[in-house]
């Protein structure tokens, strides 16, 4: 009705947003542009799969400030440069990981010292930093873990939520360490992983000390082993037929865990 329409616009700032955390963002935006909460109205537009991108406010505060200054409806459309530079990015991690194993390759311990560069803002940086300690070494039964993770703030791009929150950063460190350890011990990297994956018979746990919901990795490695061996044979045959002129492009087989 007419009265309701007037109430919606009278001395009240209205912002349309595709936020996936609209009640979380409202106080952040209100505080940022100096508008009391009772004078700010947020309308959630339909949004598709954001993969975490809109777990952070992006252009809402800019729109709000522009509307207050212009005292009229405003619209903002980013060009490609602005879309790249004015939105949050996956925070880079700097991980230092050490692994210990017995003479057979069975993992005994993990030590880690990690940093998350979260850019200039603290928004959810603590949660992301926790992920480095939760996920580094995940997938393997490691009886002793000492892993310290810290957040640092810089003038780099501000950190936002991204798909597989913290997992790529964590697994980059521990999976490279697994490869290095396997190479030093002369153990096939596939077999090193199969030997140390979660096993219900051994009561192995995730890095936080809890058992996984499902013990499935052992069966997956058994299923993948013949495919892996066939792949190794195929790659060896192709490389053997090479004249060596393109050695840096030599074929190899890759292992991917597929974990998130």
Predicted regions and their residues:
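Structural alpha/beta core scaffold segments of enzyme domains
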Residues: 3-6, 10-260
């Amino acid at each position: 009705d007419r009265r309701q329409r007037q109430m919606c616009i009278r001395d009240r700032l209205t912002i349309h947003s595709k936020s996936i955390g609209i009640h979380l963002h409202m106080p952040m935006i209100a505080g940022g542009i100096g508008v009391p909460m009772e004078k700010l109205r947020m309308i959630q537009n339909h949004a598709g799969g954001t993969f975490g991108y809109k777990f952070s406010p992006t252009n809402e505060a800019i729109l709000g400030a522009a509307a207050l200054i212009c005292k009229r409806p405003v619209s903002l459309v980013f060009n490609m440069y602005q879309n790249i530079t004015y939105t949050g990015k996956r925070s880079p991690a700097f991980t230092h990981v050490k692994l210990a194993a017995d003479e057979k390759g069975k993992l005994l311990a993990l030590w880690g010292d990690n940093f998350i560069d979260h850019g200039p803002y603290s928004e959810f940086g603590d949660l992301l930093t926790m992920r480095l300690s939760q996920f580094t070494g995940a997938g393997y039964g490691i009886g002793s873990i000492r892993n310290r993770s810290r957040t640092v703030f810089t003038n780099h791009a501000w950190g936002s939520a991204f798909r597989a929150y913290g997992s790529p950063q964590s697994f980059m460190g521990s999976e490279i360490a697994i490869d290095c350890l396997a190479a030093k011990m002369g153990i096939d990297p596939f077999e090193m992983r199969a030997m140390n994956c979660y096993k219900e018979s051994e009561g192995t746990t995730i890095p936080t000390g809890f058992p996984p919901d499902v013990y499935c990795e052992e069966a997956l490695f058994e299923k993948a082993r013949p495919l892996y061996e066939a792949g190794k044979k195929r790659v060896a045959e192709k490389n053997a037929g090479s004249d060596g002129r393109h050695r840096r492009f030599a074929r190899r087989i890759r292992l991917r865990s597929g974990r998130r």
